[in-house]
């Protein structure tokens, strides 16, 4: 068991017996899970899973007391109610002084409300709870598509959140819109939205990009034998694209980086003249 300290007071915490650890088995079956996460699953009293069905079956081979939370989803059911039920199921076992593991697709902290809320609630109730990282979809995307997010910068949004709120894009950076299959969904149900909602999204993106700008639909594989799905097409063709609930939209930069000359001049004034060549190299000059 971890020895944990209060972030505020720096004092050792006295925890109740039950524990909760949320882990991520990664994206690809058996290939991404860390030994640390695997050991947590093997040593748990009970494991709850919310992953691809194939991955859930494999996790059950590591611990026979494994239960899927997927049955809590239902057509026309508010996803927030489903998340509350998932959280309640795990916390009930923690309160029974069990070592509980929640295994969530990819990274348990990325596009997954239940692990964050469950850990917060467990901690507030005096139980030890924490998260172990896993390989997430963005890590796979960078590798599969050869993208370095540090080269031009990278903005990431959940597609519906981008649509519902006044967000600003930087078209000189990569833009990644997650959960494209739910884009524009106001019902908060598990349904797949369609061409009309995606047309609204495209209309918003056309404020920043040309209709012919090339964008990619990306899907990470689940099995080691599968290849990633990467489909390139024009931005204005997105409404009629073949989209699934695991589709992600990747938008490459649509314009060059614009130098901030005023700031560069200020920074150059800080350095001695002998460093001029190095400062020019840093700016790619």
Feature-to-residue mapping (PLM):
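Class I S-adenosyl-L-methionine
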Residues: 2-132, 247-248, 272-285
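Beta-strand/loop-alpha-helix module characteristic of Rossmann-like adenine-cofactor folds
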Residues: 8-23, 128-130, 137-285
């Amino acid at each position: 068991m971890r020895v944990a300290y209060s972030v505020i007071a720096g004092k050792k915490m006295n925890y109740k017996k039950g524990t909760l650890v949320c882990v991520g088995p990664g994206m690809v079956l058996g290939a991404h899970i860390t030994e640390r996460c695997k050991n947590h699953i093997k040593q748990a009293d009970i494991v709850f899973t919310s992953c691809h069905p194939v991955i859930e079956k494999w996790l059950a081979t590591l611990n026979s007391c494994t239960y899927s939370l997927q049955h809590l989803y239902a057509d026309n059911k508010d996803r927030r109610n489903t998340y509350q039920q998932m959280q309640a199921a795990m916390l009930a076992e923690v309160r029974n002084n069990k070592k509980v593991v929640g295994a969530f697709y990819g990274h348990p902290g990325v596009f997954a409300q239940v692990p964050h809320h469950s850990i917060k609630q467990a901690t507030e109730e005096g139980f030890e709870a924490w998260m172990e990282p896993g390989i997430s979809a963005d890590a796979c995307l960078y590798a599969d598509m050869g993208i370095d997010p540090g080269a031009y910068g990278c903005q990431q949004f959940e597609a519906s959140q981008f649509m519902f709120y006044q967000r600003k894009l930087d078209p000189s950076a990569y833009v990644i819109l997650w959960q494209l299959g739910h884009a524009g969904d106001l019902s908060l149900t598990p349904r797949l939205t369609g061409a009309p909602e995606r047309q609204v999204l495209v209309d918003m993106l056309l404020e920043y990009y040309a209709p012919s700008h090339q964008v990619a639909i990306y899907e990470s594989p689940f099995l080691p034998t599968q290849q990633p799905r990467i489909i390139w097409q024009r931005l204005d063709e997105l409404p009629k694209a073949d989209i699934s609930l695991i589709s992600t939209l990747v938008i490459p930069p649509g314009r060059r980086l614009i130098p901030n000359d005023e700031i560069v001049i200020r920074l150059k004034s800080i350095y001695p003249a002998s460093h001029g060549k190095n400062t020019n190299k840093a700016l790619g000059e």
